[in-house]
């Protein structure tokens, strides 16, 4: 293989790696957002339940 051909293969490998990395990162962001939403909903549910508020005052912004 000539130098030009090796350089072309190198560029293709770098491009493919970048595309895979970028796509994986975007998918990961979506999972993080979904987990964050679930945590928020769980905390809101706790903050509307008096026994849960009593057991976890720090979650709802209240101190003992």
UniProtKB/Swiss-Prot annotation:
Lineage of producing organism: Eukaryota, Metazoa, Spiralia, Lophotrochozoa, Mollusca
Predominant location: secreted
Subcellular location: Secreted
GO cellular component annotations of the record: extracellular region
SS bond partners: 46-52, 47-60
Keyword Signal assigned: yes
GO molecular function: acetylcholine receptor inhibitor activity; toxin activity
Protein name, entry field: Conotoxin Vc1.3
List of residues that carry Cysteine amide: 60
Additional note from the record: Negative results: does not show activity on alpha-3/beta-2 (CHRNA3/CHRNB2), alpha-7 (CHRNA7), alpha-9/alpha-10 (CHRNA9/CHRNA10), alpha-3/beta-4 (CHRNA3/CHRNB4), alpha-4/beta-2 (CHRNA4/CHRNB2) and alpha-4/beta-4 (CHRNA4/CHRNB4) acetylcholine receptors. Does not show inhibition on high-voltage activated (HVA) calcium channels currents that are mediated by GABA-B receptors.
Family that this chain belongs to: Belongs to the conotoxin A superfamily.
